[in-house]
């Protein structure tokens, strides 16, 4: 996963992230501002799932995206 691609396009990508993880608020996403560790932590907090499962889910999500 090339997270730099996500960080560099955060304003466009955060809508897709919110579609996948709807419990994340706009304020959460603004605070995360593309930081992978913060995103993982916030998903763990909102969904109550383990970090390794969050990373797997993020990898799966990333691989399903169409990157231009």
Predicted regions and their residues:
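Intrinsically disordered, low-complexity, hydrophilic segments
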Residues: 1-68
């Amino acid at each position: 996963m090339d997270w730099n691609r996500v960080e560099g396009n955060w304003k466009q990508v955060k809508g897709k992230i919110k579609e996948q993880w709807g419990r994340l608020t706009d304020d959460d996403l603004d605070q995360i501002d593309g930081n992978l560790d913060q995103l993982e932590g916030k998903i763990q907090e909102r969904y109550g799932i383990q970090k390794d499962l969050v990373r797997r889910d993020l990898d799966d999500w990333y691989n399903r995206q169409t990157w231009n």
